[in-house]
Amino acid sequence: MSGNTFGALFTVTTFGESHGPAIGCVVDGCPPGMSLTEADIQPFLDKRKPGQSKYTTQRREEDKVQILSGVFDGKTTGAPIALLIQNTDQRSRDYEDIKNLFRPGHADFTYHYKYGHRDYRGGGRSSARETAARVAAGAIARLYLKRYLNLDIIGYLQQMGDLKLQFENENEIDKNPFFCPNNKQIQELADYVDRLRRQGDSVGARVKILARGVPTGLGDPVFDKLDATLAYAMMSINAVKGVEIGAGFNAVEQLGSHHRDQMTAKGFLSNHAGGILGGIATGQPIEVSIALKPTSSITTPGQTINTEGEEVTVVTKGRHDPCVGIRAVPIAEAMMALVLMDHYLRHKAQCK
């Protein structure tokens, strides 16, 4: 199985399965001399880890990270940084009933026909459990970008199902389990998720990610445009079905006289481009939105086939998120950081 590495200079290779003994990653290309401890990485993993509220999966993983290499006396050496996260709360028995079935909307069917042999426990390699390793790697990138460039990344839930959230205060985002920027809508979100659980169903979401303090000039033309890399990175996240940069699909209805970001001696008058022109950062905030599908792991019975091609009914057991968009926030932040870190190193390598 290939396709487990992301990046050009700052690279991340993840490994492990949902119900295996551990997951982890190897981060290569981190500059030497940066202070780094497990305690620096842990807060980012804590933001993503499961079982923190009744509104997400009840699988309870501590997600304690171990640094195995690449750090000596509290500083990066420039060598590959190996990170390990133990899996401690697997419940593989929940998946015994579906080991010979293909769950609708999951990768079971495609993994089976591509590889001929799959780990059915929690989706194996296709599980979003893999994203914990991305968040750990992204933490290293975020720490570097903040310390050396004063670059900030912030993500939040923008919409759950048909419930649109009004942005009021970014200081509220990390104070609630929904990463919602409006404390007046928290109860509405809680009631929504409770209703979904009772119905045995799920719902999709929209998440927005901002990067502020991005140096002008990051990104490359043509195939390695910054927005192209961001779209590639975001689409690699489980359940993501759409990506918008700046105005995104709203640009379809806009006139050129409105959409163009006019400039003055003091800067841009708008940011419909989302901080990127010609694939290169303008210095304005980079704005990315992602659409996530509703998880197919629900208790509502559905039609499918088994490995023999016979039609059967399936009910998905296990512990799952009613809305995967909630915990996608720190994952999307991590992918933004990995892209910007990689492009920063690429920019330094070829430009003054």
Swiss-Prot record:
Pfam annotation, one family: Chorismate_synt
Annotated binding of FMN, by residue: R125, S126, S127, N238, A239, G278, K293, P294, T295, S296, S297, R319
PANTHER family, A to Z: CHORISMATE SYNTHASE
Cofactor: FMNH2
Single GO cellular component term: cytosol
Binding site for NADP(+): R48
Upper taxonomic lineage: Bacteria, Pseudomonadati, Pseudomonadota, Gammaproteobacteria, Legionellales
Catalytic activity, reaction form: 5-O-(1-carboxyvinyl)-3-phosphoshikimate = chorismate + phosphate
UniProt-listed Enzyme Commission number(s): 4.2.3.5
Organism of origin: Legionella pneumophila (strain Lens)
GO biological process: amino acid biosynthetic process; aromatic amino acid family biosynthetic process; chorismate biosynthetic process
Cofactor: record remark: Reduced FMN (FMNH(2)).
One annotated GO molecular function: FMN binding
Xref: PROSITE patterns: CHORISMATE_SYNTHASE_1, CHORISMATE_SYNTHASE_2, CHORISMATE_SYNTHASE_3
Keyword Lyase: yes
Gene: aroC
Family, as annotated: Belongs to the chorismate synthase family.
Entry annotated with the keyword NADP: yes
Protein name per its UniProtKB record: Chorismate synthase
Subunit and partners: Homotetramer.
